[in-house]
């Protein structure tokens, strides 16, 4: 997707409306139109990057540096019982708009708050050696971007 076709880039450029929550030189945050729960906010970099894999470390740092401020604003405004903070990367993980974005989803402790993430444990499937092998493969595959 090019910058010209990106709905989030159009929001940043003022071509499409959005309920803005926060803006600085590098980051823009606005309410998700779906409002999975009241206060559901998206935090995006102003520079177009497809997903976290495509995002330079400095841009990621700018993006994540404002998350606590926005999360605390949501907490103060609505007193949620908790909050999920997540990024969907690529279609298989649920990414629908291919511009890096962080979801801040307030949770109100009710079954109908709109978000249904649940992890199933597989700890019995992995030995200590399996975990060490997985960690070694991940660590050996990383490229330092600092």
Predicted regions span which residues?
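HIT superfamily nucleotide-processing domains
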Residues: 1-146
């Amino acid at each position: 997707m090019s910058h010209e076709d990106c709905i989030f880039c159009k929001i940043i450029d003022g071509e499409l409306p959005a309920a803005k929550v926060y803006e600085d030189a590098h980051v823009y945050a606005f309410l998700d139109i779906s409002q999975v729960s009241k206060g559901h906010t998206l935090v995006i970099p102003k520079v177009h990057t497809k997903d976290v894999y495509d995002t330079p470390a400095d841009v990621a740092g700018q993006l994540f540096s404002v998350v606590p401020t926005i999360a605390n604003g949501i907490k103060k405004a609505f007193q949620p019982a908790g909050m999920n903070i997540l990024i969907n990367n690529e279609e298989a993980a649920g990414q629908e708009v291919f511009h890096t974005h962080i979801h801040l989803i307030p949770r109100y402790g009710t079954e109908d708050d709109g978000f249904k993430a649940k992890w199933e444990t597989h700890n019995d499937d992995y030995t200590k050696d399996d975990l060490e092998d997985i960690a070694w493969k991940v660590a050996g595959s990383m490229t330092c971007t600092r």
